[in-house]
């Protein structure tokens, strides 16, 4: 669900990263951020909302447009922790020398967090991802690749990550387990991304990482290993797609892509929202109290297109599991009606982008 882009080379890193994030916007997200290492200094910018907002915030630091070096950036879809600047990636260790962007779910993050807090580490966010930079900082002994490998061995779950450090300017370390990562090979520059679409303006030569692969990339070199630190070779593939085709992957059109991605989409939606130890759901951003939820006796869902179809699935679950009468409305028609909304009715407008006009207009009462 989230997007990752990393760059090391001759260009100013921040503009490359922001352009890469724009090419990943179709994946959906609620916040964004970037970190750049230049002159052995770590620069970081994060914001809630669209990449355009991140670009505006970054514009308040004019030096970012000029700093050549390496950097990483990320668009986040909240799982652990609500959408906020603190919870947005990249996450840094306490010293501010290691920055990490992460896709996936760290299933044992609570155990790792308690262990780190017991050693005096202070956390800034509510996310599972923040344990990673702290683990890397604790394992660092002069080689970033080795420190990242040591940290990853402690993780249970899935990850696609990119890491930079002010201690090793020009180096981006990346790794994958269950979350896609692809390296783009340029001339005097190299990139890493979660999706080929972010790489196409700069290169058509790519290396797909396998699960368990870890790589350190510089502007002119890729050091690729497995998690046991054994050097490995991967085929260099040539991409002849355009940007539109890249977004569709290997599918002829988006409809087929969305159909076959449904199992993965459902899994991603559930990840991080179930506390198996407590047997409860984690609903970050839900502002209704348990008392208010108990008073709900009817649910109305409004959406357009695929959002409406998601609502239709929700209708079955609400009625089957919660025993609450539920109806689904076409948002384009709902806004022009004067629907009967009784007391204790929960209305849920759905929009994949958060900007669907019909859902938004009904939400604000137009």
Feature roles, as predicted:
Residues 294-366:
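Glycine-rich phosphate-binding loops that contact phosphosugars or nucleotide phosphates
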Residues 1-248, 252, 261, 267-300, ...:
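Conserved short alpha-helical segments that host acidic/polar catalytic motifs at enzyme active sites
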Residues 253, 257, 307:
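Internal active-site segments that recognize and position negatively charged phosphoryl groups
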């Amino acid at each position: 669900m989230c997007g990752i882009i990393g760059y090391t080379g001759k260009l100013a890193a921040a503009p490359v990263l922001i352009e890469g994030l724009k090419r990943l916007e179709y994946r959906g997200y609620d916040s964004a951020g970037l970190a750049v290492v230049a002159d052995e200094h770590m620069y970081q910018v994060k914001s809630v909302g669209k990449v355009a907002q991140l670009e505006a915030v970054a514009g308040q630091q004019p030096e970012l447009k000029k700093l050549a070096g390496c950097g990483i950036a990320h668009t986040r879809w909240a799982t652990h922790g609500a959408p906020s600047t603190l919870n947005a990636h990249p996450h840094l260790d306490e010293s501010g020398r290691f920055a990490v962007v992460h896709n996936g779910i760290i299933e044992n993050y609570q155990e790792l967090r308690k262990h780190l807090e017991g050693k005096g580490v202070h956390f800034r966010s509510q996310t599972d991802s923040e344990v990673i930079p702290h683990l890397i900082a604790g394992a660092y002994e002069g080689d970033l690749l080795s420190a990242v490998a040591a940290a990853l061995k402690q993780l249970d779950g899935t990850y696609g990550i990119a890491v930079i450090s002010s201690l090793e300017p020009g180096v981006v370390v990346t790794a994958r387990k269950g979350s896609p990562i692809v390296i783009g090979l340029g001339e005097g520059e190299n990139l890493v991304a979660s999706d080929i679409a972010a790489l196409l303006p700069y290169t058509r030569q790519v290396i797909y990482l396998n699960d368990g692969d870890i790589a350190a990339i510089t502007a002119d070199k890729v050091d690729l290993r497995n998690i046991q630190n054994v050097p490995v070779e991967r085929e260099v593939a040539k991409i002849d797609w355009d940007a539109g085709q890249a977004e569709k992957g290997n599918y002829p059109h988006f409809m087929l892509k969305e159909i076959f991605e449904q199992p993965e989409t459902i899994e991603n939606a559930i990840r991080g929202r179930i506390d198996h130890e407590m047997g409860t759901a984690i609903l970050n951003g839900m502002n209704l109290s348990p008392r208010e939820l108990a008073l709900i006796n009817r649910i109305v869902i409004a959406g357009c297109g695929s959002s409406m179809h998601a609502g239709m699935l929700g209708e079955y679950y609400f009625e089957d599991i919660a025993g609450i009468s539920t109806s689904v409305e076409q948002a384009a028609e709902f806004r022009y009606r004067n629907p009967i909304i009784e007391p204790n009715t929960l209305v849920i407008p759905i929009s994949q982008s958060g900007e669907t006009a019909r859902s938004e207009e009904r939400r604000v009462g137009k």
